[in-house]
A protein has these predicted regions:
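An acidic/histidine-cluster motif and surrounding catalytic segment
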Residues: 1-94, 102-146
Length: 146
């Protein structure tokens, strides 16, 4: 899983010289995700992914700049979405990770045009990842009980 997430970050985030990035992925239960969604986004109910990007949040004078990204994913949302034809739990989890990384890269999906652009990028990145990884082998069925 680490390799897939590293590759996803490489595909989604711009490369910046002399800057490192720390990325934390958190998997939350629906209740916790709903609380975060209300507190930080102002929306009621659960959501699939929330991203926080703290550019230069960990800057230490004289040392390499470090950005910190936190991505919160709700596996229960992925499980529910996987009930739709052509979708799997594993591909939804990867999609949510990619979606969060694209937000961290500055992409938005608030307007119809932005949403279309973001969906195109999501499809491109997940397609590249799928050619390299078998999502079902990475996210074993046991992770559904998070």
């Amino acid at each position: 899983m680490h390799s897939l997430l590293f590759q996803a970050a490489t595909l989604c985030l711009p490369e910046e010289e002399n800057k490192s990035i720390e990325i934390d992925f958190h998997f939350l239960a629906p209740r916790e995700m709903a609380q975060m969604n209300m507190q930080y986004v102002g929306h009621e109910g659960i959501t699939d992914v929330i991203c926080f990007n703290y550019p230069e949040a960990m800057a230490i004078p004289g040392e390499e700049e470090t950005s910190h990204i936190e991505i919160f994913i709700c596996p229960e949302a992925a499980l529910k979405a996987s009930e739709k034809p052509g979708r799997t739990y594993e591909s939804e989890i990867v999609l949510y990770a990619v979606h969060g990384l694209l937000h961290a890269a500055g992409e938005n999906d608030l307007s119809a045009g932005e949403k279309k652009k973001m969906r195109k990028k999501e499809k491109s990145v997940t397609g590249k990842l799928r050619r390299r990884y078998n999502f079902e082998d990475i996210f074993k069925k046991e992770t559904r009980n998070i």
